[in-house]
Regions:
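N-terminal signal peptide c-region/cleavage motif recognized by signal peptidases
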Residues: 16-21
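Gly/Gly-Pro-rich "capping" loops immediately C-terminal to redox-active cysteine motifs
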Residues: 28, 42-72, 78, 82
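Bacterial N-terminal signal peptides that target proteins for export
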Residues: 1-9
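Cleaved targeting-peptide boundary
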Residues: 22-30
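Detector for the c-type heme attachment site
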Residues: 38-45, 97-98
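Repetitive helical segments and hydrophobic/amphipathic motifs
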Residues: 12-13
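The canonical Cys-X-X-Cys-His
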Residues: 33-41, 92
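C-terminal capping alpha-helices of c-type cytochrome domains
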Residues: 69, 82-100
Length: 100
């Protein structure tokens, strides 16, 4: 009986954690979608604005943190990057670096 209760608890815990992971993924996609207005669908630029898709995660994170701190001058990107936490910046870096 104890074994069944333990297995049931593990199953419910797994379901709860998968829901949390899904919520994080939705949040990341939502904030990443704001980038797509200028950087194109999926981060693939259709114009003069640089593409984000396919850049390495570290590069995206570094650029966003430099924009946020003011180390890299840019009026528009500073305003955008300033609204994100470091965790959100990391998540966006991973999102655009991963193949879709």
């Amino acid at each position: 009986m104890y074994k069944k209760a333990t297995l049931a608890f593990a199953g419910f815990a797994g379901l709860a954690l998968s829901g949390i992971a899904g919520a994080v993924d939705v949040h990341t996609r939502t904030i990443a979608s704001t980038c797509m207005t200028c950087h194109g669908p999926g981060g693939r630029s259709l114009g003069a604005v640089p593409s984000l898709a396919g850049l390495e995660q570290d590069r995206i994170v570094t650029l966003l943190k430099e924009f946020k701190s003011g180390a890299r001058p840019a009026s528009i990107m500073k305003r955008h990057a300033s609204g994100y936490t470091d965790a959100e910046i990391e998540a966006m870096g991973a999102y655009f670096a991963s193949p879709k």
